[in-house]
């Protein structure tokens, strides 16, 4: 990537397992993450800002995505979170949720991290369904080099915006099926479906309500993290 010199590129390309308990290693990766975020903001002429609203969240996520046990010691608003469980990042519009997850997607890809994920949006997911009539690309990916499927970790940004109909078909039911499938994938493989949303936990319960409470019950596996602050747009 153009924002790293040759020596730094060698440093990240030699391994995909890093010991972030070493503060020097942590600082290197924190700077790399910021560089990834800045590369995403370059066309807007902006710089990524680390401040009191996101600093602790970024530290947790850097530990988390590198499987560092220190992740479970980080307190965010008095709460700790678990390794291995998917992330649900919520907050107001413009707080920077999608940018953070997009930056991590780029960072994890570049460092060849086994926790790398595809970052997409709810609108992209629904458009895929409207074109193809299914969501297999975001589920098991049957036929992708294996008759048993080849699922991958993903992050769906802006979940909760799917309350619409398409030729009379309820998109909420389609998303519910997706969430069921992603829960099964997580229990079987450990591959996560991370989420960002503008909705509060209370609003999420209303959006994903079903008579048996199955969706909400499965969403209890999530590390729910609230990103506060004014709009950064």
What are these regions (language model features)?
Residues 1-82, 229-233:
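A short, basic N-terminal segment
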Residues 86:
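Walker A (P-loop) ATP-phosphate-binding motif of ABC ATPase nucleotide-binding domains
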Residues 89:
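Hydrophobic anchor at the beta1->P-loop junction of P-loop NTPases
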Residues 94-100:
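Conserved glycine(s) of the Walker
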Residues 107-154:
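AAA+/P-loop NTPase substrate/partner-engagement loops
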Residues 157-159:
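Walker B catalytic acidic pair
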């Amino acid at each position: 990537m153009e924002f790293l010199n040759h020596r730094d590129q060698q440093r990240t390309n030699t391994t995909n397992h890093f010991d972030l308990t070493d503060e020097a290693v942590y600082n290197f990766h924190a700077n790399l993450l910021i560089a990834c975020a800045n590369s995403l903001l370059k066309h807007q002429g902006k710089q990524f800002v680390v401040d009191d609203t996101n600093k602790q969240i970024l530290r947790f996520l850097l530990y988390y995505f590198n499987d560092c046990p220190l992740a479970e010691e980080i307190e965010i608003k008095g709460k700790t979170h678990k390794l291995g469980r998917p992330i649900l990042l919520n907050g107001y519009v413009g707080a920077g949720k999608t940018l953070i997850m997009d930056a991590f997607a780029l960072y994890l890809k570049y460092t060849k991290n086994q926790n790398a994920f595809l970052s997409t949006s709810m609108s992209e997911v629904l458009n895929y369904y409207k074109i193809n009539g299914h969501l297999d690309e975001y589920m098991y990916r049957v036929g992708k080099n294996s008759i048993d499927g080849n699922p991958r970790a993903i992050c769906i940004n802006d979940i909760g915006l799917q309350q619409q109909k398409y030729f009379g078909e309820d998109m909420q039911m389609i998303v519910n099926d997706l969430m069921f499938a992603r829960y099964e994938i997580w229990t079987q493989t450990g591959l996560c479906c991370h989420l960002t949303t503008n909705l509060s936990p209370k609003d999420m319960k209303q959006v994903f309500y079903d008579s048996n409470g199955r969706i909400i019950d499965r969403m209890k596996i999530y590390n729910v993290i609230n990103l506060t602050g004014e709009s950064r747009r």
